[in-house]
Amino acid sequence: MSKWRKKQLQEIAFLRPTETLKKGDIAPNIPMANIKEFQRDVVKIDYSEFRGGTKFRNGDTLLAKITPCLENGKTAFVNCLQEDEIGFGSTEFIVLRAKENIDERFLYYLSISPEFRKQAISLMEGTSGRKRVNENALKISDFLIPDFEEQRKIANILSAIDDKIQINNQINQELEAMAKTLYDYWFVQFDFPDQNGKPYKSSGGKMVYHPELKREIPEGWGVESVGNLLDKVTKAEKIENNLIEFIGEIPVIDQSQKYIAGFTNNENGLIQPQKGHVIFGDHTRVVKYINFDYARGADGTQVLISKNEHIFKE
């Protein structure tokens, strides 16, 4: 293992490197909304008229500098542009470009490391709700850096993990689409398999009108209040967004699209399901099934358990 040396950020990276785009040019645009929390790749590119903003190219890192985007982990590695293409984005990005003998992917992984994030967040200034990182202070901050060969090895390993995560996310999206289709067949079209394996309603299954729902439902089905079927877990401390770490002992589950929001070492937030919990976002309506020890995120993350003998319990 090489010796790690302490270097200022400005020694290893250009901050806001100079690029040229003419006002009025149509160019790739990456707004803040197109960067997801703790996700390496940009979600999508928009093409629009350049009127101002930060400019970047492939290999650069986009680091959100404003609250709560920085605390929430909005940092991305640009690899979605054409060769020699210049893109632009929010003025709330700090653009990092690797200098000589610095692996550009290593620079990205450095920027999402707990040490870097903690330092950047500590340098935020301004009024509550509109705080921004002091870039002049950030660029003279010290970080431990290995030699180029070890940087590349570290980046290769972490990139392979991110590639695997991306594949798993795609698989999850396909499975979710299948689950929605299955739900539609069962509970909207009522074409679940009958005793002969045929679609119930399409095969002449008996339907009865339900006055409360003002529609027909399969014979034998009933209507029940959600409150009579499910209960909420209120115990355990909730983990605020700005306290969620990139690395830790306990995974944090919140109501975002991301399955695991991050990690914490706060054991007061630990929840240990016997078999599994359903997580429901009362803002996002995102639903997750969790069957491992975890901590709950704050701001609308609900933990649901069954209180009805006919519904699977933890």
Q: What are the functions of these language-model segments?
A:
Residues 28-43, 84-87, 251-254:
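Short, basic/aromatic beta-hairpin or loop at an interaction surface
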Residues 41-51:
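Short alpha-helix capping/helix-loop boundary micro-motifs
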Residues 1-20, 144, 148-153, 159-185, ...:
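Non-catalytic DNA-recognition/assembly elements of restriction-modification systems
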Residues 49-50, 127, 266:
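Short, solvent-exposed loop/turn positions at domain surfaces
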Residues 53-54, 58-113, 258-314:
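A short beta-sheet element
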Residues 14-36:
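Short beta-strand/loop turn elements enriched in aromatics
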Residues 2, 85-94, 125-155, 294-302:
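A short glycine-rich beta-alpha junction/loop motif
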